[in-house]
């Protein structure tokens, strides 16, 4: 099983590239284990104040936003025979993977993509005020994504930088961890 865990905002270009190279027999997209948009919005309401910019910092974790029933269903699917690809935000919750790739994206690049119309995670807010998109990311999405990245950091086999569209870069997890010492 190849698991590609992603920071929110990584686009389908990376998914398509990995599918082309890995040629999986079975694909699981991790986005499906998260609560649906309306439920997520209800959970996030206390942290997203009325103003365009100010909010309340969310101190929870990514798994707070994951539906345990869906997660269990997808975890059983990950034992499918053949080449399985588990891809997306929080993918390592579904399966740790025989190989774990973490696909990263800088917050600045995410802001640039928001300006081009990218929605927030599990939302359809393409045309929403850019400051509200950034507020949702700053107070909630980036917090949980950063915690999750640190939780799995020591287990990452390859670290993929997806900041430059059309030009992803990859380094081994060991090389990155050594460079950061």
Task: Name each model-derived stretch.
Residues 18-28, 73-77, 89-91, 129-132, ...:
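Catalytic cores of nucleic-acid editing and processing enzymes
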Residues 1-38:
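N-terminal active-site beta-alpha-beta segment that forms phosphate/nucleotide-binding
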Residues 21-22, 71-124:
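ATP-dependent NMP and nucleoside kinases share a basic, alpha-helical "lid"
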Residues 106, 112-116, 123-145:
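Extended, regular secondary-structure scaffolds
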Residues 2, 26-28, 85, 99-102, ...:
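Hydrophobic/aromatic beta-strand patches that form the interior of the parallel beta-sheet core
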Residues 1, 14-23, 116-119, 138-181:
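NTP-dependent small-molecule kinase module
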Residues 4-9, 87-90, 163:
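Structural motif
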């Amino acid at each position: 099983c190849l698991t590609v865990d992603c920071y929110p905002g990584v686009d389908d270009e990376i998914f398509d590239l990995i599918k082309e190279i890995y040629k999986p027999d079975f694909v699981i997209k991790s986005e499906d284990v998260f609560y649906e948009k309306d439920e997520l919005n209800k959970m996030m309401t206390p942290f997203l104040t009325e103003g365009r910019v100010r909010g309340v910092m969310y101190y929870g974790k990514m798994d707070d936003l994951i539906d345990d029933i869906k997660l269990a269903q997808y975890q059983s699917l990950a034992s499918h025979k053949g080449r399985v690809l588990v891809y997306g935000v929080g993918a390592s919750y579904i399966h740790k993977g025989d190989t774990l790739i973490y696909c990263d994206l800088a917050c600045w690049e995410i802001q640039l993509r928001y300006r081009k119309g990218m929605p927030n995670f599990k939302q359809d807010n393409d045309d929403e005020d850019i400051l509200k998109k950034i507020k949702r990311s700053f107070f909630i999405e980036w917090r949980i994504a950063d915690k999750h990245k640190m939780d799995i950091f020591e287990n990452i086999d390859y670290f993929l930088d997806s900041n430059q569209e059309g030009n992803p870069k990859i380094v081994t997890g060991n090389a990155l961890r050594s460079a950061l010492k």
